[in-house]
A protein has these predicted regions:
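His/Glu-based metal-binding/catalytic segments typifying zinc-dependent metallopeptidases
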Residues: 125-184
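Charge-rich, well-structured scaffold segments of protease-associated domains
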Residues: 1-125
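Phosphate-proximal small/polar/acidic motifs at interfaces that engage nucleotide phosphates
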Residues: 187-188
Length: 188
């Protein structure tokens, strides 16, 4: 990457600024996404995660997960014109965050980025407004997947913490360390 950095960054900038938006490729990708999403119908982990997020978060919250069926419907209904409009509104240096990891030189990288992305304005940043989660009554939900020999257990609780709260990051790390996945200490 180091020796080809200018060329790689220039190609990246070109692809981000001027994507092809090929109609046939768009339809192929939609079918691929639908196929991948349909597999979630038989995935206990995915179905459990969706059920838990729906139990904790209201529909207007970004942490709320749509059902697999709703995701498939959204993919089917998506249009290339909507994708083009989204790109036009949101893509640009005003809202872009670029992370490059590897054997690179910061000064050369910065110069290459400035050269390749100069004169590209646009991209809006919007303050997201969404419905906050609130405490709800305890609930047990069973998600049945016929003929599935495995089962998964999901446990969640409303904490009232918001991302901006000082305790959010320590709580997040503690939660992950104790029980988020098979690496968690509660699974040992």
């Amino acid at each position: 990457l180091k020796k080809d950095l200018d060329q790689v960054i220039a190609l990246l900038a070109e692809e981000l600024r001027n994507p092809l938006f090929d109609a046939k490729e768009f339809e192929n990708l939609k079918q691929q996404f639908i196929g991948n999403t349909q597999q979630d119908l038989n995935d206990p982990g995915e179905r459990g995660s969706i059920a838990l997020s729906q139990a904790i978060y209201p529909k207007g919250n970004p942490n709320y997960s749509l059902s697999v069926e709703d995701n498939i419907a959204n993919i089917k209904n998506a249009t290339l014109d909507e994708v083009k409009a989204f790109h036009k509104k949101y893509f640009g240096t005003a809202s872009m965050r670029l992370v490059i990891v590897g054997d690179t030189d910061g000064a050369n990288l910065n110069a290459s980025l400035k050269k390749s992305f100069k004169n590209w304005n646009g991209g809006v940043t919007e303050k997201l407004k969404f419905e906050e989660a609130s405490k709800a009554a305890a609930k047990t939900e069973l998600v049945t997947i016929p003929e599935k020999p495995s089962a998964e257990l999901f446990v969640g609780q409303f904490t009232g913490l918001k991302r901006a709260d000082a305790d959010y990051i320590p709580f997040y790390i503690g939660n992950y360390t104790l029980g988020a996945g098979f690496a968690g200490r509660l699974m040992q």
